[in-house]
């Protein structure tokens, strides 16, 4: 027998998650995470979580409006580090710390993906991310060149500086 109440609550939770996602600027993390998970058959939460700090860095480096919003979120979380940029970076650092605490990978390399295989799949990764509707909703929408760099930085665990 189905638990109709449980199904209803799950549906509501999924809807609320989707609505909050559309308003929270994590579209680029989803676009890149979907590409990684789709090609390398990895869990959705792991791939999106892995890309979250990289994509937030990318966004704050190119969108003043997003920087202000991310800094506001950081301050709400008690990360009052000074300027908007410092607060946003503190939030990103906290996300990385949390990933370490829960033993999640901080780079694609830590997922056990071979560098040669990664490079072989680069065109597919970029094309999937470019055509992902979640990527298109980001406050800073990357082109092919930026996505390639972002994917390569994430492979090595290098902070985004562009």
Go through the PLM ranges and name each one.
Residues 10-18, 52, 95, 99, ...:
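Short alpha-helical scaffolding segments that buttress acidic/His motifs in well-ordered protein cores
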Residues 119-162:
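Short, amphipathic C-terminal "tail helix"
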Residues 6-9, 28, 47-51, 69, ...:
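Residue-level detector of well-ordered alpha-helical segments, enriched
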Residues 42-119, 160:
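Gly/Pro-rich interdomain helix-loop hinge
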Residues 3, 26, 45, 115-119, ...:
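Alpha-helix N-cap/helix-initiation sites
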Residues 15-48, 132-137:
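Glycine-rich phosphate/pyrophosphate-binding beta-alpha loops
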Residues 1-24, 145:
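Carboxylate- and glycine-rich phosphate/diphosphate-binding segment that chelates Mg2+/Mn2+
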Residues 2-5, 86, 109-112, 137-145:
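Short coil/turn segments at secondary-structure boundaries
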């Amino acid at each position: 027998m189905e638990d109709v109440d449980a199904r209803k609550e799950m549906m509501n939770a999924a809807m609320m998650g989707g609505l909050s996602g559309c308003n929270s600027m994590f579209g680029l993390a989803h676009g890149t995470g979907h590409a990684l998970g789709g090609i390398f058959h990895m869990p959705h939460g792991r791939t999106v979580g892995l890309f979250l700090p990289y994509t937030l860095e990318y966004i704050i480096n190119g969108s003043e409006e997003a920087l202000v919003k991310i800094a506001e979120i950081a301050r709400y979380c008690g990360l009052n580090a000074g300027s908007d940029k410092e607060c946003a970076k503190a939030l990103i650092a906290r996300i990385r710390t949390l990933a370490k605490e829960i033993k999640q990978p901080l780079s694609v390399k830590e997922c056990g993906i071979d560098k040669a295989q990664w490079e072989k799949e680069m065109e597919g990764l970029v094309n999937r991310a470019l055509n992902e509707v979640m990527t298109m909703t980001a406050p800073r929408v990357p082109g092919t060149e930026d996505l390639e760099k972002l994917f390569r930085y994430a492979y090595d665990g290098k902070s985004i500086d562009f």
